[in-house]
UniProtKB/Swiss-Prot annotation:
Keywords: Ribonucleoprotein, Ribosomal protein
Family per record: Belongs to the bacterial ribosomal protein bS16 family.
BP GO annotations: translation
Pfam families, alphabetized: Ribosomal_S16
PANTHER family linked to this entry: 30S RIBOSOMAL PROTEIN S16 (PTHR12919), SMALL RIBOSOMAL SUBUNIT PROTEIN BS16M (PTHR12919:SF20)
Gene label: rpsP
Taxonomy of the source species: Bacteria, Bacillati, Bacillota, Bacilli, Lactobacillales
Organism this protein belongs to: Oenococcus oeni (strain ATCC BAA-331 / PSU-1)
A GO molecular function held by the record: structural constituent of ribosome
Protein name (Swiss-Prot/TrEMBL): Small ribosomal subunit protein bS16
Cleavable signal peptide: none
GO CC, alphabetical: cytoplasm; small ribosomal subunit
């Protein structure tokens, strides 16, 4: 089972609102998901993005793959750098 961190479309016609969710890659875009880890509101200026850093970091360490859009959000929040550093530290520990 491959797990993705992706956008789940909410809102109404011409008023999009997205939840950032962890879901099985085989599930539909707006189908079942495992856990909600944030939201994205593109209507507000500037766009509002809320991320639950701890939950997202845990899922990334377990191997969840973010989609391109979510990866950009995570990079802006500094989570991708934190993940990279944590994986390097774990790799160095295993070599000792």
């Amino acid at each position: 089972m491959s797990v993705k961190i992706r956008l789940h479309l909410m809102g109404t016609k011409k008023r999009p609102f997205y939840r950032i969710v962890v879901a099985d890659s085989r599930a539909r875009r707006d189908g079942r998901f495992i856990e909600e880890v944030g939201y994205y509101n593109p209507i507000t200026k500037p766009a509002e993005i809320k991320l639950n850093d701890d939950q997202i970091f845990n899922w990334l360490m377990k191997g969840a793959q973010p989609t391109n859009t979510v990866r950009n959000f995570l990079s802006d929040a500094g989570l991708m750098k934190k993940l990279h550093e944590a994986k390097l530290a774990a790799k160095k520990e295993s070599k000792k």
